[in-house]
Amino acid sequence: VDNMVPEKQKLFQAXNGIPVHLF
């Protein structure tokens, strides 16, 4: 499941345009 976490982080980071290190 850990593999899915970084992918979502990148998606959020690209969509929001902000660094999502909290997630």
Curated annotation (Swiss-Prot):
Q: Name one GO biological process term.
A: mitochondrial electron transport, cytochrome c to oxygen
Q: Which GO terms describe its cellular component?
A: mitochondrial inner membrane; respiratory chain complex IV
Subcellular locations according to the entry: Mitochondrion inner membrane
Q: Which pathway does this polypeptide act in?
A: Energy metabolism; oxidative phosphorylation
Q: What is the membrane topology noted in the UniProt record heading this document?
A: Single-pass membrane protein
Which GO MF terms does the UniProt record name? oxidoreductase activity
Q: Which UniProt keywords apply?
A: Membrane, Mitochondrion, Mitochondrion inner membrane, Oxidoreductase, Transmembrane, Transmembrane helix
Briefly state the protein's biological role: Component of the cytochrome c oxidase, the last enzyme in the mitochondrial electron transport chain which drives oxidative phosphorylation. The respiratory chain contains 3 multisubunit complexes succinate dehydrogenase (complex II, CII), ubiquinol-cytochrome c oxidoreductase (cytochrome b-c1 complex, complex III, CIII) and cytochrome c oxidase (complex IV, CIV), that cooperate to transfer electrons derived from NADH and succinate to molecular oxygen, creating an electrochemical gradient over the inner membrane that drives transmembrane transport and the ATP synthase.
**Protein family according to the UniProt entry:** Belongs to the cytochrome c oxidase VIIa family.
- Please give the subunit comment from the record: Component of the cytochrome c oxidase (complex IV, CIV), a multisubunit enzyme composed of 14 subunits. The complex is composed of a catalytic core of 3 subunits MT-CO1, MT-CO2 and MT-CO3, encoded in the mitochondrial DNA, and 11 supernumerary subunits COX4I, COX5A, COX5B, COX6A, COX6B, COX6C, COX7A, COX7B, COX7C, COX8 and NDUFA4, which are encoded in the nuclear genome.
UniProt-recorded name of the protein? Cytochrome c oxidase subunit 7A-liver, mitochondrial
Q: Which organism is it from?
A: Oncorhynchus mykiss
